[in-house]
């Protein structure tokens, strides 16, 4: 679920940036998404959105699905339990790892999505 995703982000980035900083970044980080991602971090969010879409097509509810995971050496590791839980956990873990590698450009936080995300 979204709280677990937030915790995974903190695991992967070693707590260097609050999870909320990703909630309104670029065209895809946060609710919804459209247009072309503005940078590598925004592409991470688009891939995560697409992964959640795939989870939904499998009958899962990714924003609400609780799963089991551990933070081992600043790497989120999923503990498989069921199809939906494992799929959603994998979406979140991949995004958290992607966020940790991608540069954060403050200029892409809280952008005007109506003009920048076409």
Swiss-Prot record:
It is found in: Secreted. It catalyses: a 1,2-diacyl-sn-glycero-3-phosphocholine + H2O = a 1-acyl-sn-glycero-3-phosphocholine + a fatty acid + H(+). It comes from the Eukaryota. CDD domains: PLA2c. The keyword Ligase does not apply. PROSITE patterns: PA2_ASP, PA2_HIS. One of its GO terms (cellular component) is extracellular region. The active site is at 48, 92. SMART domains: PA2c. The keyword Secreted applies. Signal peptide: none annotated. One of its GO terms (molecular function) is calcium ion binding. Disulfide bonds join 11-71, 27-117, 29-45, 44-98, 51-91, 60-84, 78-89. Gene3D superfamilies: Phospholipase A2 domain. Keywords: Calcium, Disulfide bond, Hydrolase, Lipid degradation, Lipid metabolism, Metal-binding, Secreted. PLA2 catalyzes the calcium-dependent hydrolysis of the 2-acyl groups in 3-sn-phosphoglycerides. This is Basic phospholipase A2 PA-10A.
């Amino acid at each position: 679920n979204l709280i677990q995703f937030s915790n995974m982000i903190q695991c992967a980035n070693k707590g260097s940036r609050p999870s909320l900083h990703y909630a309104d970044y670029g065209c895809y980080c946060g609710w919804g998404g459209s247009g072309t991602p503005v940078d590598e971090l925004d592409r991470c969010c688009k891939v995560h959105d697409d992964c959640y879409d795939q989870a939904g097509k499998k009958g899962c509810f990714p924003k609400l699905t609780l799963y089991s995971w551990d933070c081992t050496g600043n790497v989120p590791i999923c503990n498989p339990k069921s199809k939906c839980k494992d799929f959603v956990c994998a979406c979140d873990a991949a995004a958290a790892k992607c966020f940790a590698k991608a540069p954060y450009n403050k200029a892409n936080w809280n952008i005007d999505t109506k003009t920048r995300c076409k």
